[in-house]
Design a protein with these regions (language model features):
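Domain-level signal for soluble alpha/beta catalytic cores
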Residues: 1-359
Length: 359
């Protein structure tokens, strides 16, 4: 029997301090050469054990082998020059120096497949692997070749599909596409963003997910969120299109958020990764706070389709805080799972009593 309310993380977890400076995005590696290769494997083992000890059900790699959730993938592609950089506005809210697309993009070799094989050897639990989505990749580059966000996105979709198929062959059970750009460029999402995502999942023999959030707890994101008003209804613009898509699982943030949780109704029928852990604060949720968020979500999603998760990745947090939040996620899910199982037993007993009365 499949476990009810299986827990997972949205993506990144803090790296060990011997591998990279903690609590920092884009943190450079402290090791080189063969030491870095082995160090990354050791970090994968540590990340796995952190999740196992916390009782997380669906394991991720914690993004231990990458410096950034988007650019590490792009670094492995041809047609992109990391020395030729331009300043662009990422997610339409902050300036960043990014590499330039200078020619046709392609994937000469697999990017994360060896890492996935290694993680598969370490655990029998289900594995979810996150890779960037086509639109978010486009939004993290300067394009001097295709001169069209849509054309570049379609090329990335084909490349991501190649990578995803090999990840599945390596033993990955769920492929997650990270698309924070979906929360910003609504017209493009509906015109071609979801279609490109469908191209990326084409032919995959596994479950697929899309993660759409309001970002890490960094200043650029928290400042942006202050401009969004008392209700964050961005999901309302994109959920109807996603509801009709072939994506199996849709992720959204709910904990300590201004997102009206009833927006989940727009994607009823899909499996939902409900963000029940706030990654923008060092305050560790209580199990009851997590449980309260999950109970609210259950008004709009069937229990068998609810996947408790974190709002986003936790790279900027300390390992102690991240560990506490993982424990809270599991404990909160346990509370609600036990409530649901108790209700189910009561309903079964009630039915038995009714049948006995008839007989």
């Amino acid at each position: 029997m499949k476990k009810l309310l299986p827990t997972s993380t949205a993506g990144s977890l803090p790296k060990p301090s011997w591998l990279a400076e903690p609590e920092k995005l884009w943190s450079p590696w402290k090791l080189k050469g063969e030491e870095l290769t082995y160090g990354k494997k050791d970090a994968l083992r540590v990340s796995l054990q952190e999740q196992v000890h916390a009782g997380i059900d669906i394991i991720g790699d914690g993004e231990q082998t990458r410096q950034h959730f988007v650019t590490t993938f792009i670094e492995h592609l041809s047609g992109v020059d990391f020395k030729q950089r331009e300043v662009v506005k990422i997610r339409d809210r902050y300036d960043a120096s990014v590499p330039t697309v200078v020619g046709p993009v392609s994937r000469p070799n697999p990017v994360f497949v060896e890492d996935a094989k290694f993680l598969r050897q370490q655990t029998d639990q289900p594995i979810k692997w996150a890779i960037p989505g086509p639109m978010t990749m486009v939004d993290t580059l300067y394009d001097n070749h295709y001169k069209s966000r849509e054309k570049l996105a379609w090329e990335f979709a084909k490349i991501l599909n190649q990578e995803a198929k090999e990840l599945v062959a390596a033993g990955v059970d769920i492929i997650q596409f990270d698309e924070p750009a979906f929360n910003v460029f609504f017209d493009e999402v509906n015109e071609w963003g979801v279609a490109c995502l469908e191209r990326a999942i084409e032919g995959l023999e596994c479950e697929t997910a899309v993660h759409i959030c309001y970002g890490y707890g960094i200043k650029a994101n928290t400042d942006w969120k202050k401009t969004l008003g008392s209700e964050w209804r961005q999901y309302e613009e994109i959920f109807p299109k996603l509801q009709k898509s072939n994506i199996d699982i849709i992720s959204l943030e709910c904990q300590n958020s201004h997102v009206p949780i009833e927006l989940i109704e727009l994607i009823r029928g899909k499996k939902i990764m409900v963000g029940a852990i706030d990654v923008a604060t060092n305050t560790i949720e209580t199990p009851e706070e997590v449980a309260a968020t999950l109970r609210k979500a259950l008004k709009y999603v069937d229990a068998e389709n609810l996947y408790p998760c974190t709002n986003c990745g936790m790279t900027p947090l300390s390992r102690d805080v991240a560990r506490g939040k993982l424990n809270a996620l599991r404990a909160g899910a346990d509370i609600v799972r036990n409530e649901l199982l108790s209700q189910n037993r009561e309903e079964i007993q009630k039915t038995k009593n009714q049948v006995a009365q008839v007989l």
